[in-house]
């Protein structure tokens, strides 16, 4: 007989009106393969091969074939970034604050000071791929908005700018591992000896250099550890070669000034004397190139003097440029039409410099004039479409045979989070502004994380079919005017109102490397999680009567009363600011007693999903079609949403197993009215996940394939199955019987599958029912040899093993609570003691 919905409800024990047999008879029936097959057929769960066209959209969920078209906003504001500088001695500052750090805290802080990134191999892409043509209708607008965003990041000290093959410049405060260059000289900041001659010491820089003459550049080969010294002739590179910024040292022998002070006192002292003026003739440049600081091969193919003109002439490039600049070339030409760019270029007398240099120059490993990832802009988030966010695509490191396997780190699961945070504390959450950009990257990582652009001329040339620019050679003037068009002219005129003289600066090629960790690399979330968890660990030890917890950049503080929380907030904020961590005070949220964290609402009653997720699920069920095959890609999105809320339903994850099966088979899934009604009933009533309590286990379950046994206190029970069952199924049934007979929330078992509380591998009906019966039950592992229920399960009722005293302590998982936080009293004291709430009495860990 075909199964009716009522029958199905009866089987799932979800309906009290229909009479069900005793649990001991009903449950083993649910494990029957034949019954599960019939139910699957009745609910159309197994019929994966369908010939009707698939549905690719359900509500807001789209499949593989209909991705949402990104919307470009010409009014996007570039967010401002504070001058973020995380203090290098962060570990020492934490020690002053809380006393000696634990091993875990030290290790994590060392990991991010500085962060290192060495992929197995790096694929270099042409500069044209630097800014992605993500918005075909707004190409020029998107180009300038992105360039402005990159410029903002560079000014904020988040990016390096590649100056030559081996040097880069940046803004902001330098770190000790960033070796500075001054006019082509490497400067090592150490104590001065022999007058003011720099003394050779071993710098903690990019290069591990030999102790003999480490101040003079030798040839370096790149290795997995950045740059290693390579024995070879000294400074043999040809004069004028792009990439060598080092002044040539005229003495061929290697010297260290600490040993032989009479030698060449300053490295390349003639280099700075002979830094030639800007308008030297090409002949003199060639003749003196071994004395002047080396020429830089700019990405547009014209040699520029590096660091050789006085700052006063920085903005006066337009008066007598030495090299041909695509933008300024328009000034001296006849307009080719009403929409010629020369009209725009003649609007302004002084277009500013062609390139800007940072406040500091450092040496870097050899960096080609290429990019390793593309960038584009999107809305900052769904709620803030006024500001833009930069998306960096470094997916090459996660693909192919040379992909980097990113380190794994513990994400708190729902139960751990509830055990930890479900209490009657007052909560607030802190917003760390630009959290990723706090963590410094070693300059040796720069060649692997390059972004940039080939300049406006190449960008426009790629898009206009009538123009051909080969290898940066700007040929005749006719070629120059090939890029003039009405669309470009109108776009640039509008942008001129926004950016003014910077249009010229942004039209030049640029190559930038990351100085802080970028968001598009799998290493970054790991590093951020390590960083914030270590900081929270320090805060927890400094304020033992409070709770601080973090996941990525989401930091929450809890205290017993609102007044206490406010004083804690002040102290913690000051501490974080002293480390160089930037908080956004406008985004501090005070939650009262119900904390909103990681998509959950956590209170003293337990945890539930946040309201916007519940609304999304309701909306999703309203739009869900029945008897129509739904694309498995859409099912993936669906399962993602329903899976998040599954622990709050009666049947949990097992209820979604038919959907998982269709995704695995990459087949369409058809919802029958019955299955949809069953699921929607599950999700309309959500139950909180409660905090586990410590206790003493007094109920034990055990099973063999043929029978089960229970030990409830001093009482023993046993029974046999009608037919032999697989051992895991039998153990699960025994646990269900123990729960239903004793009502205990703490059960001892020797089966690892039951302990894991993942019931998705059992027959579908049994998995759903077991999840429903065992919801909120905690399990304790007891070895078979000590299990009091072992004998009854084998049919031996006469033998009594002594009842174990098995204490149970709820776990907070691996949620980075390195310093054990003292337990928080569960009641609010009548009067909070305010003698000194922030006094730190340090005790050894």
From Swiss-Prot:
Protein name, entry field: Protein P
Molecular functions per Gene Ontology: DNA binding; DNA-directed DNA polymerase activity; metal ion binding; RNA-directed DNA polymerase activity; RNA-DNA hybrid ribonuclease activity
Activation/inhibition comment: Activated by host HSP70 and HSP40 in vitro to be able to bind the epsilon loop of the pgRNA. Because deletion of the RNase H region renders the protein partly chaperone-independent, the chaperones may be needed indirectly to relieve occlusion of the RNA-binding site by this domain. Inhibited by several reverse-transcriptase inhibitors: Lamivudine, Adefovir and Entecavir.
EC code: 2.7.7.7, 2.7.7.49, 3.1.26.4
Organism annotation: Hepatitis B virus genotype A1 subtype adw (isolate Philippines/pFDW294/1988)
Site (Priming of reverse-transcription by covalently linking the first nucleotide of the (-)DNA): residue numbering on this chain: 65
GO biological process: DNA replication; symbiont-mediated suppression of host innate immune response
Pfam families in alphabetical order: DNA_pol_viral_C, DNA_pol_viral_N, RVT_1
Protein residues bound to Mg(2+): 431, 553-554
Disulphide bridges, residue numbers: none
Keyword Coiled coil: no
Note: Hepadnaviral virions contain probably just one P protein molecule per particle.
